[in-house]
Amino acid sequence: QPGLAHSVHPRVEGLEPGTEHFYRFRVGRELSPVGRFRTLPAAGETPESFSFGLVSCQAWYHGHFTAHRHLAAEEDLDLVVFVGDYIYEYGITGTNLWRQGAEVGEAHRVEIETLEQYRLRYALFKSDPHLQAVHARAAAVAVWDDHEVQNNYTGPLSDTGIGEEDFAHRIAVAYRAFYENMPLDVAALPEGPDTDITAGFDVGALARFSLLDSRQFRDAEPADAAEQQREDRTILGTEQEEWVGERLASSEATWNLLANGVVLVPINEKSTDMWDGYPAARRRLLAQMAEAQNPVMLTGDIHKHVAAEIPADPDEPGEERLGVELVCTSVASDGDGAEDAGTPETWTQHEYVKLYDGRRGYVHVRLTPEEMVSSFHVVDWIEADDTAPKQLTARFTTPAGEPRLIPA
């Protein structure tokens, strides 16, 4: 339909479980490249393994998508999980266009606000051949964070003081463009500034995935410490909290993975855009996670690789652990980066943080009935070109039943 920018969201039925398939699209005489995916195992079946890539934060203008080049070349890849900031809304100008050899037209030089501008921004980012290769390599699922609309927006509120009526329209067109361009079910078609991107699926009896919306239903960032500690504050909203709680409580899977946009483990109470800004909501979620086997949080947002063991008590972290959190660095946001970029001491001062690396890259995760192996890959440069080789900065094993990150 022209009203949906000619995007299609087909529901294909009757495919055999656990089977590799290839597909392409035809429009007139035009044929797309061939894509590949593997259907999920049958309900109750336990596959020998299931592997996925974890990526986020791909500011096209900050550098080449070298991480995607390496991810697409992974031999063992059943799924790609995008955990937010698939696009960025900022105007692209001489001050932030660090991708050498790239040029953009006038339409990209202003902050995007209209449906056509959001559509054009997706088209620009998706023109990257390495991102195209990732989508062709394996099935993908996605959640959003903030830049799919506006930096640090909270629920219906703009971070820059745009009036609620005007901002509601901006949310509506941003959500529409996200739906048009991302692998969402037809049930997620937005109605104005409202939609439901939460989704869940099971990898047989091996794993249960729950995709969370940590942006649309959240309360505003707190004005002071007293408000921050209020018991009724939420980041997921009441209905979504109940939904994920039911999924965790009813799960019989060995691994229970949640994907969301912002960091869960306690790091800094001043980081109010993360779960640190919603401590009561975090306590509720951790109580729900404790009901399931081997909970794992998948996160992006911070443009750093972080691997952390989740404290059972986030308010007074001791030695008891509840699960693990895997935070992937950015594909391109913040440019080349460096191993110690940012404020590593803010993170590494916590005993439960086992890795911090500020270079660009992705995470590859392999699940088996016995263990989870998480491999954190990095590249040293992305601004000059896309030729940087990948390096393994860290690999951890998490045995089933033991919420630890053991260097491997």
PLM feature spans:
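Metal-dependent phosphoester/phosphodiester hydrolase catalytic core
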Residues: 1-408
